[in-house]
Amino acid sequence: MPSELFDLDNARAARDTFLDARRTATLLHKFLDSHRELKSYKNGRTINVDGHTLSLAAVTAAARYNANVELSQSAQVKEGVEKSRAVIAEKVEQGTSVYGVSTGFGGSADTRTDQPLKLQQALLQHQHAGVLPSSSKTLGVLPLMDPMAATSMPEAWVRGAMLIRMNSLIRGHSGVRWELIEKINDLLRANITPVVPLRSSISASGDLSPLSYVAGTLTANPSIRVFDGPSAFGARKMVSSRDALAAHKIKPVTLASKEGLGILNGTAFSAAVASLALTEATHLALLAQVCTALGTEALCGTTGSYAPFIHVTARPHPGQIEAANNMWNLLQGSKLASGHEEEVSINQDKYELRQDRYPLRTSPQFLGPQIEDILAALASVTQECNSTTDNPLVDGNTGEVHHGGNFQAMAISNAMEKTRLAVHHIGKLMFSQSTELVNPAMNHGLPPSLAASDPSLNYHGKGVDIATAAYVSELGYLANPVTTHIQSAEMHNQAVNSLALISARATVTSLDVLTILMSSYLYLLCQAVDLRALRRDLDVGVRAIIAEEVSKLFSNNLSSEEMDLLHSSLYSKYQHTMDKTTTMDAVDQMKEVTASFAPMLVEVFTSTRVMPDALSAIPRFRSNISSRATQLFDRLRASYLSGERGATPASSLLGRTRSVYEFIRVSLGIRMHGSENYSAFANGLGVDDPTIGQNISSIYEAIRDGKFHDVVADLFEALPRSKL
C-alpha cells in the first residue's frame, strides 16, 4: 500500500509539473515575464552577459532603452575565454594552419599567410563594402527616399547586435581576448553606435559586412562613422569612429589573430533584428486578442464563441485554447457581449443571424496557430542569442579547432518567415473585423462608417476602411518567403545561405504595417462602443417616450395590460427598424421608425372592435414620437460629442477591455469623432477636431514607443490565471 501511494503521489507531481510547464509555455506568460524583465532593466537593473542567459527582453532593453550592460564576473566564464584564446595563440606560434588565422576567407581559403595581424585588416577591408550616405549635408536635389533611413540601420538594431555578439564571444569558443569583448561593451556604455549599411548581408557566413563596421569602429578606422551624442533622439551627430573614441577616451583595438573573424563571423545582426521583431510580435498577438474581445463587444457578439467546451474539450490545440481563454476572460462583465445563447423558437429569431460571423466566431481557431508559430520563433531566436555562431570554433579544454558552419542563420530565417506569415494572418483577422464594424449591413445597428451625426454629411470611417485594405494587402505581399530567393554567392563557396537579416528586416516592416492597421482598428472600436452607449441612452429615452404617448393618446381605448403589451411591441419594432435604417439622417430615420408602427396600431384598434378615435390619433401618435425622438437623438449627439457625458461614456458597458478604451480616450486624449460634422463644419476643418489620421497616429506611436505594452501587460496581469 505505501508503495502504491508513493506512485500515486509521483503521478500527481508529474501531472502538476506538466500543467505548470504548459502554463508557462503560453504566449501570454512569455509576454508578461518578458515585460516584467524589461521593466526591471528600464528601472536600473544591469544586464549580465554570461553567454547562456541572454533574453529577448535584455536585448530590447540594451538596444532601445540604453540599459546598463556588464560582463559576467564569473572566473569560470573568463577562464573559458582565456583558454580558447591561448589555443589560437599557440597555433599561431606553432605555425599551424587554421582557417581565418593563416588562410584566406571563404572560396579563397586556399591562400596562406604568416601575417595573421595583417590578415585581420584584409578581412575588414573587403567587407567594408556597404552603401551609406557620404555626408549628412543638405542635398541639392530632393531624394526619392530619406538618405539615412534608406541605406543605414536604425541604432537599436546595431546596439542589439553588439550585445548579442558579446554574448556569443564570452562563451569561450571563438579564440578572442577578454579585452576585445570589454571594448564592445565600452561602445555600448558610451552610446557610440556604428553607422551600419542596411543591406549587403546574406547571413550565410554570418552577417559579415554589418559586423565589419563594428570591428572598424573598435579599431578607430577614420572612414568608419558612428552616431555619437547624448541620446537616440537628442543631438546625435555622425562623426568618424576615431574622433568618437578619442572624445570618450576609449583606446582603439589592434585586432589579434582571428579576432577580426571572431567579430565578423556571426549571426548577431540577424538575431538582434529578430529579437526586436519578436518582442513586438508577441505584444501585437496579445493586443489582437484584446481587439477581438473589444470587437465582440462593439458588434454585440456572443462570448459563446470562446466557450471552454469548444476549445479545451473538443479541439485542444494549445494556441487555440490560449486565445479563447484570454478572450473569454476579457469579456467577463461586459454588458455589450451576450453571455450565453438563449434557446428560442423558430419564429422568435426568424431572419436574424443565429451566430457571429467568422471573424469573431472562429478567431481562436485563426489566432491559435499564429500564437504557436510565434512561440516556436521565440524559442529559436532565444537559443540563437545564446549560441556560438562563428567559424572556426575553439575547444579550450582539448585544444581542438573545429571547422563548421554555425554561422548559417537558417534558424533565424525560419523563425522570421513564420513570424511574418503570422503577422499577416493577424492583420487579415483585424481587417475582417474592422470592415464588418463600419458596414451597416453587418454591424448590428451601428451607423455607416461609424458616423456620430447624420450620415449624409459624415463618412467618418470610410477612409480608414480603405486604408486598412491597403495595409492588409501590403502585409500579404510582405508575407511572401524571402528564403526562396537564395542565390549562390562568394565564388560558389556560399552556394546556400539563409538571408536571415533580409527576412528579419522584412518582418520589422511587416510589424510596422500591422501596428498601423491595429491602431486604425482600435480607433474605430472606441468610436463604435461610444455609439453603442449613445444608442442605449437613446433606447431608454425612446422607450419612455413611447410609453408616455401610448398612455396620453390611447388610455381611453385600452386597459393597462393592453397598453403595456402595445408599448412592448412598439418598442421592439422601434429597435428592429432603427437597426435597419442606420443609413438615414435622424429626421428621416425617426419618420421611418414611426411609419413602421402604423400596421401594428391599425391591427390593434381593428382586431376586436373598431375604435375610430384611436385610429384617428395614429398620425398624431407617430408625429409626436418622431419629433420627440429626433430631438432626443440630437441632444444626445450633442452631449456625447461635446464631452458632456465624460471622456469615456462607454466604460460601464465594457468588460475587462475597459482599460484599453480608457487609455485611448483619457491618456491619449482621443475624443469621440463627429463634432465638426454635427456643426456642419461651422469652423471649417481641423479646428474643432484633429484629423482622423492624427488620432490614429497617436495610437500608433503609443504602440511603437512601448506605452501600450504597459497597458496590455497590466490588463492581462489582472485576469484570473487559466486552469487549463
UniProtKB/Swiss-Prot annotation:
Compartment(s): Cytoplasm
Pfam families associated with the record: Lyase_aromatic
Cross-link (5-imidazolinone (Ala-Gly)): 204-206
Gene Ontology biological process terms, A to Z: cinnamic acid biosynthetic process; L-phenylalanine catabolic process
PTM sites of type 2,3-didehydroalanine (Ser): 205
Alphabetized UniProt keyword annotations: Cytoplasm, Lyase, Phenylalanine catabolism, Phenylpropanoid metabolism
GO cellular component terms listed in the entry, alphabetical order: cytoplasm
Sites where the protein binds (E)-cinnamate: 265, 355, 361, 391, 462, 490, 493
Protein name: Phenylalanine ammonia-lyase
Gene from which the chain derives: PAL1
